[in-house]
């Protein structure tokens, strides 16, 4: 069953362009990360930025939540987190601070 996820994160001021650039470079610099997301059935993945506040809104659909959650233990993911950490609010393990949002409406 496909699960729809919505999350809020924060990118630090003055790093908006760099945040976007690093995501554009993900398929080339971090192909293992892209592969892991695809293998977990992640699709329809988008991240939006509110440049007034630095708030990021991520939306994605995941076909296998167990595989998706396991990505956090992969070296490729930890390297990605370390690469992105200077730009964002992060936890001690360098993972981004995220807030999961409950879905309150959906229209197919």
Curated annotation (Swiss-Prot):
Pathway: Carbohydrate metabolism; L-rhamnose metabolism. InterPro entries: Dimeric_a/b-barrel (IPR011008), L-rhamnose_mutarotase (IPR013448), Rham/fucose_mutarotase (IPR008000). The active site is at residue 23. The keyword Isomerase applies. Keywords: Carbohydrate metabolism, Cytoplasm, Isomerase, Plasmid, Rhamnose metabolism. Substrate binds at residues 19, 45, 80-81. It is found in: Cytoplasm. GO terms for biological process: rhamnose catabolic process. Gene3D superfamilies: 3.30.70.100. Pfam families: rhaM. It is an enzyme of class 5 (isomerase). One of its GO terms (molecular function) is L-rhamnose mutarotase activity. Its EC number is 5.1.3.32. It catalyses: alpha-L-rhamnose = beta-L-rhamnose. One of its GO terms (cellular component) is cytoplasm. It comes from the Bacteria. Homodimer. Belongs to the rhamnose mutarotase family. NCBIfam families: YiiL_rotase (TIGR02625). Involved in the anomeric conversion of L-rhamnose. PANTHER family: L-RHAMNOSE MUTAROTASE. This is L-rhamnose mutarotase.
């Amino acid at each position: 069953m496909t699960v729809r996820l919505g999350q809020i994160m924060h990118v630090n001021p003055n790093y908006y362009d760099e945040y976007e650039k690093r995501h554009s470079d993900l398929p080339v610099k971090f192909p293992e990360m892209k592969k892991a997301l695809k293998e977990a059935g992640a699709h329809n993945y988008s991240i939006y930025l509110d440049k007034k506040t630095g708030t990021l809104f991520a939306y994605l659909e995941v076909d296998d939540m167990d595989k998706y959650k396991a990505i956090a233990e992969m070296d490729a993911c930890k390297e990605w987190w370390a690469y992105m950490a200077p730009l964002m609010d992060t936890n001690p393990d360098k993972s981004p601070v995220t807030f999961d949002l409950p879905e309150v409406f959906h229209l197919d």
